[in-house]
């Protein structure tokens, strides 16, 4: 198996090394693991691509490259440049430093990479490590992802539910904010929504008196509805959320089609 690994935290992020180790387990001795990751921090860029400017790509080692672009750019670079003669069978994005559960998923560059892979009909999984008081000061805050990552990916590959249409399924996996020994298991869960925890802006002044706005995030320890992703994470479970690149709301479409007749 040939695996392309990317992230949104950048080429030097600790979570990328975690995912490289996981990918090597999945690929096996006869497989290949290639890394194409952003040269700098790209958190919060979602599924953006850099079609208005060229991207610089740098070779770090035989199968490791950095790209001056977004996570989705890195996927494109991996598919159509770095691995163009031997395209990947699987794309893994992460392991993100922080959760991408609930409405956080809508901003995530980690998930943006998985979306891009799915558009090109390649199986794609986004993985993120929830951080909180019970794991952030651990020697290895990514311990849960390190320990269970390969197991979760192998299950998803075994079950083989990726869809067959033009718009296909990818997976959003979030590891709970606890150490590996405290993980209670895994649960399939839909996206939750954090009430009163969305992004806002915080005004500030520079020393020269110029006005700036900082994006400000809300607390991450607010549980979502029962059995949704962030809620199961905060209760010690790994959440697995199937997601689709088709953004159509078919329920509303059906109702409106009857009204527009």
What spans do the regions from the language model cover?
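Short acidic, Gly/Ser-rich segments with clustered Asp/Glu that frequently serve as metal-coordination loops
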Residues: 9-17, 206-208
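A cross-family phosphate/adenosyl-ligand binding-site feature
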Residues: 3, 17-80, 85-87
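Active-site glycine-rich loop that binds ribose-phosphate moieties when present
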Residues: 108-114, 141-159
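Glycine-rich phosphate/pyrophosphate-binding loops
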Residues: 118-141
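Glycine/threonine-rich flexible loop motifs
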Residues: 99-108
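C-terminal accessory domains and tails appended to enzymatic cores
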Residues: 157-166, 170-261
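Alpha-helix C-terminal capping segments
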Residues: 28, 80-85, 112-123
């Amino acid at each position: 198996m040939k695996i392309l690994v990317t992230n949104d935290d950048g080429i030097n992020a600790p979570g990328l090394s975690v995912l490289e180790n996981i990918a090597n387990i999945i690929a096996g001795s006869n497989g290949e693991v290639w890394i194409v990751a952003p040269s700098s921090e790209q958190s919060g860029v979602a599924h953006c691509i850099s079609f208005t400017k060229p991207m610089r790509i740098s070779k770090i080692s035989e199968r490791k490259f950095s790209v001056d672009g977004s996570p989705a750019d890195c996927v494109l670079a991996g598919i159509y440049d770095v691995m163009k003669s031997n395209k990947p069978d699987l794309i893994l994005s992460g392991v993100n430093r922080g959760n991408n559960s609930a409405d956080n998923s809508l901003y995530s560059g980690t998930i943006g990479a998985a979306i891009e892979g799915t558009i090109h009909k390649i199986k794609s999984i986004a993985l993120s490590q929830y951080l909180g008081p019970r794991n952030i000061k651990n020697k290895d805050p990514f311990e849960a992802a390190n320990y269970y990552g390969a197991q979760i990916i192998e299950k998803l590959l075994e079950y083989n539910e990726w869809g067959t249409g033009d718009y296909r399924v990818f997976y959003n996996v979030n590891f709970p904010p606890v150490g590996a020994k405290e993980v209670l298991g895994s649960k399939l869960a839909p996206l939750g929504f954090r009430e009163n925890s969305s992004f806002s802006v915080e005004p500030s002044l520079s020393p020269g008196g110029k006005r700036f706005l900082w994006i400000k995030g809300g607390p991450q320890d607010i549980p979502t509805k029962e059995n949704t992703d962030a809620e199961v994470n905060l209760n010690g479970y790994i959440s697995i959320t199937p997601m689709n690149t088709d953004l159509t709301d078919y329920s509303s479409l059906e109702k409106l089609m009857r009204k527009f007749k």
